[in-house]
């Protein structure tokens, strides 16, 4: 097996949208980094039945609604 071809696999802290935290192993960042989630299984519409509003990241949802709003109302 070749050496030094795999990414560094280390512990990071993951912070969920509700503030709860857990530690996991990942190739993200470097040892001890924190990954702040903007959406997680507790808030994602696919797992919550779609009852929560989508976050407007970068105005994408607003642009979509202004472009296709007439079709959505029908």
From Swiss-Prot:
It holds the Pfam family Ribosomal_L31. GO terms for biological process: translation. Part of the 50S ribosomal subunit. GO terms for cellular component: ribonucleoprotein complex; ribosome. Keywords: Ribonucleoprotein, Ribosomal protein, RNA-binding, rRNA-binding. This is Large ribosomal subunit protein bL31. Belongs to the bacterial ribosomal protein bL31 family. Type A subfamily. One of its GO terms (molecular function) is structural constituent of ribosome. Binds the 23S rRNA. The keyword GTP-binding does not apply.
């Amino acid at each position: 097996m070749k050496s030094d071809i795999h990414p560094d696999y280390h512990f990071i802290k993951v912070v969920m949208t509700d503030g709860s935290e857990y530690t996991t192993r990942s190739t993200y960042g470097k040892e001890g980094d924190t990954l702040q989630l903007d959406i997680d299984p507790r808030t994602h519409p696919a797992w919550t039945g779609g009852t929560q509003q989508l976050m407007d990241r970068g105005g994408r949802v607003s642009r979509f609604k202004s472009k296709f709003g007439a079709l959505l109302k029908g």
